[in-house]
Amino acid sequence: MKKIFLVCNAHLDPVWLWQRAEGMAEAMATFRIATDFCEKYNGFVFNHNESVLYEWVMENEPELFERIKCLVKQGKWRIMSGWYLQPDVVMPSGESIIRQIRVGNEFFREHFGEIPKTAIGFDAFGHSRGLVQILKKCGYDNYAYLRPRDKVCGPFIWEGFDGSKINTLKLYEWYNTPKGEAVKRIESYVKDFPDREVNCVTWGIGNHGGGPSEKDFLDITEFADNCKDFEFIHADLIHILMNLIKLN
């Protein structure tokens, strides 16, 4: 049966057009919502990156941080990318990008005992070919991105200037969904790609925090129950990319 992997996330620019305190408050609110959701619904998986947001939670709500650590151990909360922030990857120097990776990786190694192997550039407006070499030498096997925003999506092998290669996934349409429109995203994807064996659809309220909504989750569950052509799996990007690699 054809598979659609559903990646719930909540993109959040912590200091874009607002003060640090506001970004911090939104990050903690988003993490509270996601934590409650993971604990309530079996089979649901939440994904988030950016170690600075986890640091804020650890410093201000240690009990919430411990709950997240438990969810990570259970596989219900997945750490994406593992960077300090989700930065632009065209204008900054290679050294800057490496430091983003190193600082984030050290935090997740210390507090969660893991380092992700899939990097993301959901909101970066461009992706330098030189990034491939940096990712590979920093230990990443995979990369997922969105922009430029168009109907072209799917997996490919990206080769860097030095011959380094990385499994890469171009996402469909957008990384988040407005409240109540997750099923609309899935329907659009199925219409555009009815014959693909392995598929990825991202959802969750975001662009400035939010996370999963109960309406969307229940709508997705109902849609999945009535859709006989696809198996729907709440997952993270590494599971999707591994399935795509096996397929190709």
Q: Model-found features: residue ranges?
A:
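Catalytic-domain carbohydrate-binding cleft regions of carbohydrate-active enzymes
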Residues: 1-248
